[in-house]
Structures are given as C-alpha cells and as structure tokens.
Amino acid sequence: MSVAWIGSQPVSLMDAIQNVAKLLVSSRCPVFTIDADVHGTRSAIALAERVGGAFDHIHGDTLAREVALFADQGAMITTPGETRRRSSLVVLVGDIPVAHHELLLHLAGSNPDLGDRNKRVWFHVEGALEPPSDAGRLHRKLRPVAIGGEGLGLSGVLAALRADLLGRNQTGSLANVDRLKSALGKSRFPVFVFSGAMNSPDLAMLQGLVADLNKQGRASSLFLPTDDDAWGTALTSLWMTGFPPRTGFSDSLPSYDPVRWDTQRMVRDKEADLHVWVSARGTMPPKGRIGLVSLSRTEKRTEGAAVTISVGRAGVDHDGVAFSSRIGTFHSLTASAPSELPSIASVLQQLALVFPGRMGLPC
C-alpha cells in the first residue's frame, strides 16, 4: 500500500519527504495546521520554528475562544478527581459536549469521600434560548434541578443568578434558585462544570460568580474542553513557546496573535504561500489557492496537495501521549491496531534531517 504521493503519483516515503523539504526551503511564509498527539505536535511546532512559520490547531476558532478565558479573564479550575472526591454539589452550566457525558455519568455513580461527604446533588444552569442538546440520557441519570428564567439566554440567567446570590434587587426571578441557595449553604466545595462551547461574556460571568462564592467559602469550576486533542495541543504549545496556538516565528522568536496567525484565515487571504496540513484523525483540509502539503491519516492522496503522506494515529496505529479531560492531564496511549503507517513525529523528524544543516528536531 502506498503511503506517499507527489501530486497523483505514488512515490517512496523518502522521495516525498525530500520534496516537502524543497517546498519548505523555498517558502517565504509557511503555515502549519495541526491535529496530532503530543509527540506529533511538538515536532510540528519545532519544525515551524525552524522554517520561520506559524502554527494553529485544526479547530483553531474554538480553541482560541477557550484559551481567551484563561488569557483574558483568568479562572478558578479544579480537576475531575477533586470534583469526584470533594464536591457534593455539581452545577452544569450551559451545554456540555456529548464526549464528556460518560465522565459526568461516572461522577453520578459516586459520592464524595473527602471533606464534604453528603450525597451528590446536581443542578443545571441553562438558557431558554439555547438550541436543543443531546443530553437526554445524561439528564435522565443525573436528574439535575433546572435553573433558568423565562426568555433569558444563558448570559441573562448567569447574570441574574450572580445578582441574586449577592442579594441585589432585580426584576423577575429564576426557577429553583432557592433550592440552589440551600444546596450552596450545605456544600463545602461546589463545582460548576462548563465547556468551551460557551461564549466569552458567559465565561466571564461564571468566573465572577465563582469568585464571589470564594469570598465566604470554597468553590471552583471544572473545565471540559470541546476537544481534548485540541486542548492538549494548547498545553503543549504553552510549555514549548510560552504561548498557545496561533503563534508565529517570523522573526525567530515566538509571537502570539490570535488574528494575525490564524492559519486558515492566512490561507484564505493568501498571506501564506505554503500550507502544511497535519491531521492524525484524517480530517481533510479546506480548499485553498496556495501550495498544500498533507500529512493525514488517509488511504489515498489528498486532492490539491503537492505532496501527501499517509500517517498513523496515536492510540490506533502506534503508541503516543494525549490529553484526557477525564483525568485532567496527559496520559499514554497504546496502539489498538498497530500498523506500518509512520507517526507524524517520525515523518517530521526525517524531514528535519534532510534540511540544509541536517539537524534533527529537539524533541
């Protein structure tokens, strides 16, 4: 089976790698769009630095919004383990992605055993204007008490709830707010669960509410990212460069700008002249009018790509390391169906070795 193509022609892996090296050497503004495990991400970032490019995640817009919470607002964050062991009051805020429902169901099947040992109770702060979610099974199991107000979106409900908890006068009332107040009075460590699907004003209001509660007791929030792999890329980027994705190396030093280094925008606006698409999940790149190199988990060439290299996925084709929101940190992955597909990290390491100077990547 072919794993590399130049245009539409199958070639050896080394021929494809050498062709990619030529394209990168001749490029004046290459950009990397990444979706990989930790090893693949580290190699892609190191290569972007080597060639003076910029990098972003495939889900860059969503990830940038999630990063903004921490960069612009700050947040009080706990882990799933601390929530499971210490919190008898869990408040869901907004819609929680289906990918995290199993984690919440696992929490529902246990009770805290440290500090706060009351039976765990659930509430759900939701807006009347939210689109229907896929939370039917989750709600049947958790049976959360709904907190909301007629005609209020999530922003309005959070604002009204925060004002109510501070004892401020307001027009209208929220359903079941007295029950939540009673539960807050009994709980020693309430936790508010939210995801990156919320918008920035909602996130800021939620963190303000948590900060208010911490003036008289202890409370925190549990962040469940929209995409675990994307959040892992953000954390990997932070420890390598000091910045999240949407970072560029145009003057050799890392520079973060969520607008300037939005790689897919740069491709659309032809600010870049070469797009290196790296996808272990096999996501196809959007069509563009600049040169394209595709490192993707695919069985055929990527349409429009000057070079296509088929790569494996960590946890399926080869071992790797990835972020898991279930444990709140990175964990190792064991290949479930080992194959001969090369890993992203190994391809990029070989690519670095055929560059002028033949220096391997420092990771």
What are these regions (language model features)?
Residues M1-G7:
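N-terminal juxtadomain amphipathic helix
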Residues N19-L23, H39-V51, N111, A204-D212:
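Histidine-anchored nucleotide/phosphate-binding helix
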Residues P10-M14, N19, S26-A44, D95-A99, ...:
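Gly/Ser/Thr-rich loops at beta-strand to alpha-helix junctions
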Residues C29-R85, N214-L253:
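Anionic-ligand anchoring segments at beta-strand to alpha-helix junctions in alpha/beta enzyme folds, i.e.
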Residues L23-S27, K186-S187:
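DNA replication sliding-clamp ring fold and its partner-interaction surfaces
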Residues V67-R218, G248-C363:
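Non-catalytic alpha/beta scaffold blocks inside enzyme catalytic domains
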Residues S8-V11, R168:
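Short, surface-exposed alpha-helical recognition segments that flank or form part
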